Amino acid sequence: MKHDPIELLARMAHVHATGEAGERVPWARLAPERREARTHEAAAMLGGLGRASYPTNPEGLTAPRDIASAAEALLDAWERGEAATGETMARGMPLVMALVRSGPEGTP
């Protein structure tokens, strides 16, 4: 399975935006145009996020596949209403940024 760090970052941005608005809209239920717009926003965000300090092995994970799976699990839990927006962002962003830093060779 290929894990797209940009899509995961877009999903994190979606969690932040909809969570702040008091909504909880699953990624899959967004119109394709909205998903594409969030993905473009995420790609543009990478320049600013590169200066932020994130751990290289969040939650003790080092393998890109494990990092991506953990991020996806957090996002899925948020969509099901099992995780708060703040918790999802606090735990998910370090995971996604570690995956982004792993580069294309880190994408299984």
Where do the protein language model's features map onto the residues?
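Hydrophobic packing residues in well-ordered alpha-helices of helical domains and bundles
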Residues: 38, 64, 88-92
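Amphipathic alpha-helical segments that form the core helices of the histone-fold
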Residues: 25-50
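Short, charged, amphipathic alpha-helical segments
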Residues: 32, 85-96
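A broadly structural signal marking compact, well-ordered functional cores
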Residues: 1, 89, 105-108
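Short, charged, intrinsically disordered terminal tails
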Residues: 96-108
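Juxtamembrane/membrane-water interface recognition
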Residues: 18-21, 40, 102
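Amphipathic alpha-helical oligomerization segments
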Residues: 2-26, 47-86
